[in-house]
């Protein structure tokens, strides 16, 4: 029996890549495609809709969301309230929103996944960085993305910082009398260390965590050169959420 999937934001680069991934997996099938910019009514026999409300009564198992931070919270609530297990790759959730959605999913008995990053290598980077932070508490995070990305820092950088903060000896880095000659030059402050965001054309998704200590340094880096790198994680997420009864934040919980 195939898992029936709705993809929201299918006109975007991630959404369109997800469509091809689902079409190429015999265990999955497309139930519907949703995008406010859609002009067609169907794609290869799959019905297309402009609004989420039009698919509320549809028979489907999973709602895959690659829309925008502006809409993704309400979209995820909608999915849970209508019996679809959400797999969400759009970032920008607040901790309070994640807590609310987790509680709602438990109430509905539905699995779900909010993943700042679907690339397996990025998940490993986060785990390796958290391990290193126990021994190298002085660090900075640099994330680099394409120039159309709307949120900064990236969800991956925030998740990495959160994992590091759980194990790192808390301290403030830099000179005590440090002064920014240009506002923001030192990046965003997070628990005593800094996060830097780079936005340039030609990039896809990249991140490095740089650690420093007396006489040595350590750099952990991950690069996604193509959006196909995320599809293994999306595929895993779709197949795992239908087995679960509560939403999780981070792909690492499904590995």
Curated annotation (Swiss-Prot):
The active site is at residues 145, 149. CDD domains: DHDPR_N. One of its GO terms (molecular function) is NADP binding. Its main location: cytoplasm. This is 4-hydroxy-tetrahydrodipicolinate reductase. (S)-2,3,4,5-tetrahydrodipicolinate binds at residues 146, 155-156. The keyword Amino-acid biosynthesis applies. GO terms for biological process: diaminopimelate biosynthetic process; lysine biosynthetic process via diaminopimelate. The keyword Nucleotide-binding does not apply. Keywords: Amino-acid biosynthesis, Cytoplasm, Diaminopimelate biosynthesis, Lysine biosynthesis, NAD, NADP, Oxidoreductase. Its EC number is 1.17.1.8. Pathway: Amino-acid biosynthesis; L-lysine biosynthesis via DAP pathway; (S)-tetrahydrodipicolinate from L-aspartate: step 4/4. It is found in: Cytoplasm. It is an enzyme of class 1 (oxidoreductase). Gene3D superfamilies: Dihydrodipicolinate Reductase, domain 2 (3.30.360.10), NAD(P)-binding Rossmann-like Domain (3.40.50.720). One of its GO terms (cellular component) is cytosol. The lineage of its organism: Bacteria, Bacillati, Bacillota, Bacilli, Lactobacillales. It catalyses: (S)-2,3,4,5-tetrahydrodipicolinate + NAD(+) + H2O = (2S,4S)-4-hydroxy-2,3,4,5-tetrahydrodipicolinate + NADH + H(+); (S)-2,3,4,5-tetrahydrodipicolinate + NADP(+) + H2O = (2S,4S)-4-hydroxy-2,3,4,5-tetrahydrodipicolinate + NADPH + H(+). HAMAP family: DapB (MF_00102). Catalyzes the conversion of 4-hydroxy-tetrahydrodipicolinate (HTPA) to tetrahydrodipicolinate. The gene is dapB. Belongs to the DapB family. NAD(+) binds at residues 9-14, 89-91, 115-118.
């Amino acid at each position: 029996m195939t898992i029936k999937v709705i993809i929201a934001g299918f006109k975007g680069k991630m959404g369109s890549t997800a469509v091809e991934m689902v079409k190429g997996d015999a265990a999955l099938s497309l139930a519907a495609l949703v995008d406010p910019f859609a002009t067609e009514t169907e794609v290869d026999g799959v019905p297309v809709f402009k609004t989420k409300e039009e698919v509320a009564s549809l028979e489907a198992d999973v709602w895959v969301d690659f829309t925008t931070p502006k809409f993704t919270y309400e979209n995820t609530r909608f999915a849970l309230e209508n019996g679809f297990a959400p797999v969400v790759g759009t970032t920008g959730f607040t901790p309070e929103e994640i807590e609310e959605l987790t509680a709602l999913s438990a109430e509905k008995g539905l699995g779900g996944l909010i993943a700042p990053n679907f690339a397996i290598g990025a998940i490993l980077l986060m785990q390796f960085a958290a391990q290193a932070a126990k021994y190298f508490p002085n660090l900075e995070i640099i994330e680099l993305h394409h120039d159309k990305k709307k949120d900064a820092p990236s969800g991956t950088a925030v998740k990495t910082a959160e994992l590091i903060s759980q194990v790192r000896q808390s301290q403030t880095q830099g000179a005590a009398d440090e002064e920014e000659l240009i506002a923001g030059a030192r990046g965003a402050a997070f628990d005593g260390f800094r996060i830097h965001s780079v936005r340039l054309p030609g990039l896809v998704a990249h991140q490095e965590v740089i650690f420093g200590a007396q006489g040595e340094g350590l750099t952990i880096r991950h690069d996604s050169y193509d959006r196909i790198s995320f599809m293994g994680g999306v595929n895993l997420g779709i197949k795992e959420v239908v087995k679960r009864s509560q939403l999780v934040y981070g792909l690492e919980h499904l590995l």
